[in-house]
């Protein structure tokens, strides 16, 4: 049975072909070993998207050999998959997770223009036109990254009230009804929301220009998807939005079929 692994900056998610799945912190190697040990004797192929570098990849390779007796297949950015033409001159510098997002978008949107938005530790945007040409993208700090940066620089971040406001995924509690905060925590939340909303507004405007006014399908993935989804729907209620929380794992399924 095939095992799909999405090793991201913060979390490593996995899914078996039968639908079983799990998640561990990417720096929790022992947790990953415990999870994968339960799959010994079941896995016959491993397909991986990793942005964690060679040291992690080698450890994963050794673990798969030890537990499953097979080497993992690491996804690599390639020209021509579903006719996609990456914008980068050096393919090895395009994040493989972003490339797989484009693969997933092309497989679903077909000949429609696509915008892939990743709302994780970084906020990423990639555009794909109707001819499958990657028009490039944007990378900015994600919601939690901006909030963490503020928390590390100002004294109030160590206050009990601020720490209680932090949720387990790193995001702050929802803002109050006013657009402006009346406490430090609410001010940080409202300010970050305003920054992200402005970013997304520019995405919609610039994508419209790049696509010559043609409508596009927006694919949204990442841990902050609910927060970003609300902003996108507020900015353009008519936006065609596809929620793809496991876009990398879904794309790995497609990629594994081409590897067979």
UniProtKB/Swiss-Prot annotation:
Binding site residues for ATP: 6-13, 121
Q: In which pathway does it act?
A: Cofactor biosynthesis; coenzyme A biosynthesis; CoA from (R)-pantothenate: step 1/5
Active site location: 97
Q: Which CDD domains does the protein's record reference?
A: ASKHA_NBD_PanK-III
Q: SUPFAM superfamilies per the record?
A: Actin-like ATPase domain (SSF53067)
Q: Which residues cross the membrane?
A: none
Which positions are annotated as binding substrate?
A: 88, 95-98, 184
A single GO BP term for this record reads: coenzyme A biosynthetic process
**So which cofactors does this thing need?**
NH4(+); K(+)
Which reactions appear under catalytic activity for this entry? (R)-pantothenate + ATP = (R)-4'-phosphopantothenate + ADP + H(+)
Molecular function terms, GO-annotated: ATP binding; pantothenate kinase activity
Q: Where in the cell is it found?
A: Cytoplasm
EC number assigned by the record: 2.7.1.33
Q: What is its main location?
A: cytoplasm
Question: What NCBIfam families does the annotation carry?
Answer: baf
Q: Which family does it belong to?
A: Belongs to the type III pantothenate kinase family.
Question: How is this protein organized at the quaternary level?
Answer: Homodimer.
Put simply, this protein is called: Type III pantothenate kinase
Which species? Saccharophagus degradans (strain 2-40 / ATCC 43961 / DSM 17024)
